[in-house]
Amino acid sequence: MAKRYGKPIFPGAFTPTEILTAWEAGADIVKIFPADSVGPNYLKAIHAPLPQIKLMPVGGVNIENCGEFIKAGAAAITAASCIAPKKDIAAGNWDAITGYARQMLANVKAARNK
């Protein structure tokens, strides 16, 4: 149904079989969750025999490790709490949140340029 209306499909998967099944079913990108339990090397291992599958780690991606996930073959990353911590939202600390986002973006760009 989503494809009919031109909407992207990002199902979650974990095992290689689930990842391939999601891709063959029409996923645009397959979310790997929870990414922090397997790390960037897992994405690299999946991406080696299945380079056509776009992977997006979710869960545990942060400013420090986002570049490693990109280098391992992630097409995109998903991060929330590390960019916008509840304490900073509650305090209205928008400059800090902007800084976190800028740092993550810089780390992703640096990883893609290597």
Task: Give residue spans per PLM region.
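Catalytic cores of alpha/beta
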Residues: 17-25, 42, 61-77
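Anionic-ligand binding region
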Residues: 5-7, 15-28, 40, 46
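Short beta-strand/loop segments at the ligand-binding rim of alpha/beta enzyme cores
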Residues: 1-10, 49-56
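Glycine-rich beta-to-alpha transition loops that act as phosphate-gripper elements at the mouths
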Residues: 11-16, 35-37, 56-63
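Glycine-rich phosphate-binding active-site loops on the catalytic face of alpha/beta enzymes
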Residues: 32-40, 72-94
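C-terminal helical cap(s) of enzyme catalytic domains, especially alpha/beta-barrels
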Residues: 2-4, 70, 86-114
